[in-house]
């Protein structure tokens, strides 16, 4: 049990706009605590005297003397530093994403001099770790099968849910495999995740939908609300029976079952008596429940809140849910930005101009507009302004950010090509290109289909030719095409490559290309022999061998290629692990203690894996998500959501497609998200409500981005969008009011291009 104590009066709630010094103030408060030996004032656990909150009987006699004889423990520790560490327990540090976590962890490590154990994670990472750690409690409470859980990746979750619901008859009007089916499945899974993060029981989802939404419609669901509840509960039961965890299931297990348990709360307070939470405006509602429990137990906390943030509103975040947490803290407003930015002076006038175009006023010289007719002209002139400014020494590449409401592939490619040709590096923030868009990954998938029988329909001539070019460095595309035309033998079950002399004029290939092809051919034959003899353990081993033999070869590939290969291996390992678990459930797993599947099942799993990757569902985002070492000197390309999530700032910002309507309507909110916010009235969600939500989001975006702009802002607008339609977005008033970029800034380079 925990000593009854009033809610901590030393907890701080730091609120302020973008770059107002909230995180710095958090670090300063921790430094003050360390210098003043603050752990002396923290409430400590005492021996349990109530059976309700006590640990299980079998642990009580063993744990009580060691954990709760405080005087004996402190006397054994001896040094004052060790005593302070014992009183403080472990510090829980929560951040909105992993990049912010690492930055803040480095700063706190310097302040505490590594004297206190510090656990740094994200809210979702914390929920997942707690569910895994206390899985035995959940097994006992929910009467689950005792097996270690496996967390499903989102792409695997969608794949398995689609197959389950297809077998249950998702909807007769939905064509299996169609884009509409994928969208319907994604909507259902998102509803489960939103309900879990908001603390809403899964049984109440149909009632929420019936009160807030109109059934059907272009963006609605093709099933009735009662069917939504039945499908979600079937999916939930299916996952729990097999020990599979999704993000939504993790949120439900933690918020609904684990957090209310007295035994868990007991261990929670024993481990954490200090919580540091940065950017709580991006946390889900169940995180607010966690903080309230910790406050009731007497924990000390520092929380930072940005009213202009809420980047993940609509994706599970619920800023209004933390009002109850703030009520039990000492609120410290930080109204003024700690650094100079355009937002200090111009945030209010710009927001007013966007909300009411008739209130226009001249914008300063620091805000300029670049207007063209075609988008191709806009991209080129934007790049040329950046090149000229860097060459003139006005700004460094790492001080420039190009931000768009939707950074499409054409814009990324065009800007990257122009800037890199002038010697400027480009950083695409969380580009998330599908793995199947990379030639090396496509080559490895073709290789898998050639080694394992029964996958011939997944191999074509173009794929084989590309594989030869990628794996055989001495084979150019022309020779690869000749080899494929004469030496590739298609077959539904056993496609194969023939010896080079099957090409009558093989002498035209040359020695280098012939040698490279024969090396690939002999390697394939060796792997096929091992696979037939059941020596090849799994496709994961084959992928690793292929990478080591053909792609690595002792050199160091670029980071982007390494990240793609790592993500491919991580995805393959995860997919095979899940397949082995599912096969074990149906008693089809071989009796050997490894993860080998029966041959027919392994081929089917491999076919599904190849099709999943080729569908573009998997992107290259392995762990860690950023490159180690010093930040490179590069121009940043990002969309609005990615840039705001990264919490970065730049001297110069270029707002690409400033006239696009996506600044207002380009929300990434999940289906039905407003119904699971604590601010929802409980009535029908109307078009007026949605418009008000869009306008509030646009205001937050403007204030946030202006607060991250140091000196110059360029509003880049083309009359025609990439699809040829005229752009009439909400920021067009700003584009027309801003001073145009001087013609000398672009005329010289444009005339020479």
Residue spans for each PLM region:
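Helicase P-loop NTPase motor core
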Residues: 2-4, 18-37, 52, 63-66, ...
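Conserved P-loop NTPase-based nucleic-acid remodeling module centered on helicase motor cores
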Residues: 15, 43-52, 86-200
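Conserved helicase NTPase motor core
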Residues: 19, 217-326, 333-338, 346, ...
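Conserved helicase core region in the C-terminal RecA-like lobe
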Residues: 97, 121-126, 275-281, 570, ...
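Coupling/switch/interface segments within P-loop NTPase motor domains and analogous charged loops
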Residues: 142-237, 504-537
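Accessory C-terminal helicase-associated subdomains
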Residues: 226, 503-640, 647
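ATPase/helicase motor core of nucleic-acid motors
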Residues: 394-531
């Amino acid at each position: 049990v925990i000593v009854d104590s009033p809610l901590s009066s030393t907890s701080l709630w730091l609120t302020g706009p973008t770059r107002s010094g909230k995180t710095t103030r958090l670090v300063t408060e921790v430094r003050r605590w360390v210098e003043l030996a603050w752990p002396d004032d923290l409430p400590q656990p005492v021996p349990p005297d109530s059976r309700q909150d006590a640990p299980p009987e079998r642990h009580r006699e063993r744990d009580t003397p060691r954990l709760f004889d405080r005087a004996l423990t402190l006397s054994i520790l001896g040094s004052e530093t060790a005593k302070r560490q014992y009183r403080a327990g472990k510090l829980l540090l929560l951040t909105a994403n992993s990049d912010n976590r690492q930055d803040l962890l480095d700063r706190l490590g310097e302040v505490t001099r590594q004297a206190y154990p510090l656990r740094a994670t994200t809210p979702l990472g914390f929920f997942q770790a707690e569910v895994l750690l206390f899985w035995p409690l959940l097994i006992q409470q929910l009467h689950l099968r005792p097996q270690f859980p496996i967390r499903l990746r989102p792409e695997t979750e969608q794949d398995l849910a689609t197959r389950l619901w297809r077998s249950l008859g998702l909807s007769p009007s939905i064509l299996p495999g169609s884009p509409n089916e994928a969208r319907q499945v994604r909507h259902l899974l998102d509803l489960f995740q939103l309900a879990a993060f908001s603390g809403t029981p899964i049984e109440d989802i149909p009632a929420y939908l019936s009160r807030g939404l109109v059934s059907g419609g272009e963006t609605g669901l093709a099933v009735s609300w009662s069917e939504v509840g039945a499908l979600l509960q079937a999916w939930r039961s299916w996952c729990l029976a097999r020990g599979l965890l999704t993000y939504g299931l993790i949120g439900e297990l933690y918020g609904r079952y684990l957090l209310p348990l007295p035994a868990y709360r007991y261990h929670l307070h024993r481990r954490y008596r200090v919580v540091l939470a940065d950017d709580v405006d991006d946390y889900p509602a169940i995180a607010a429940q966690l903080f309230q429990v910790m406050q009731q137990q007497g924990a000390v906390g520092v929380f930072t809140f940005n009213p202009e943030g809420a980047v993940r509103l609509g994706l599970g975040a619920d800023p209004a849910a933390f009002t109850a947490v703030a009520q039990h803290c000492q609120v410290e407003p930080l109204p003024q930005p700690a650094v100079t930015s355009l937002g200090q002076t111009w945030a209010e006038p710009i927001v007013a101009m966007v909300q009411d175009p008739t209130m226009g006023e001249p914008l300063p010289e620091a805000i300029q507009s670049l207007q063209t007719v075609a988008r191709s002209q806009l991209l080129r002139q934007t790049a040329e302004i950046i090149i000229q400014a860097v060459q003139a020494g006005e700004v460094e590449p790492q001080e420039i950010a190009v931000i768009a409401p939707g950074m499409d592939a054409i814009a990324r490619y065009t800007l990257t090509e122009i800037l890199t040709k002038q010697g400027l590096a480009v950083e695409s923030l969380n580009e998330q290109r599908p793995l199947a868009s990379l030639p090396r990954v496509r080559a490895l998938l073709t290789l898998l289909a050639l080694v394992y029988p029964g996958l011939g329909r997944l191999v074509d001539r173009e794929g084989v030719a590309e594989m030869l070019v990628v794996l055989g460095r001495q084979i150019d595309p022309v020779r690869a095409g000749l080899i494929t035309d004469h030496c590739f033998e298609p077959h539904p079950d056993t496609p194969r490559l023939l010896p080079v002399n099957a090409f009558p004029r093989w002498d035209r290939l040359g020695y280098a290309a012939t040698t490279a092809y024969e090396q690939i051919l002999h390697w394939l034959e060796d792997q096929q022999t091992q696979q037939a003899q059941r020596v090849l353990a799994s496709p994961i081993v084959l992928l690793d061998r292929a990478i080591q033999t053909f792609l690595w070869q002792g050199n160091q590939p670029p980071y982007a290629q390494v990240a793609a290969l790592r993500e491919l291996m991580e995805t393959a390992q995860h997919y095979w692990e899940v397949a082995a678990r599912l096969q074990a459930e149906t008693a089809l797993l071989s009796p050997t203690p490894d993860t080998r599947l029966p041959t027919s099942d392994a081929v089917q799993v491999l076919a599904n894996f190849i099709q999943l990757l080729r569908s573009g569902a998997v992107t290259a985002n392995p762990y860690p998500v950023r490159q180690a070492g010093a930040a490179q000197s590069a121009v940043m390309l990002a969309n609005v959501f990615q840039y705001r999530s990264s919490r970065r700032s730049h001297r110069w910002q270029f707002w690409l497609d400033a006239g696009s309507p996506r600044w207002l309507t380009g929300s990434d909110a999940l289906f039905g998200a407003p119904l699971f916010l604590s601010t929802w009235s409980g009535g029908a969600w109307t078009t007026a409500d949605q418009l008000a939500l869009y306008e509030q989001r646009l205001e937050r975006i403007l204030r946030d981005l202006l607060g991250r702009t140091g000196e110059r802002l360029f509003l880049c607008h083309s009359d025609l969008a990439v699809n040829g339609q005229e752009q009439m977005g909400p920021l067009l008033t700003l584009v027309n009011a801003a001073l145009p970029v001087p013609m000398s800034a672009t005329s010289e380079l444009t005339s020479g291009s």
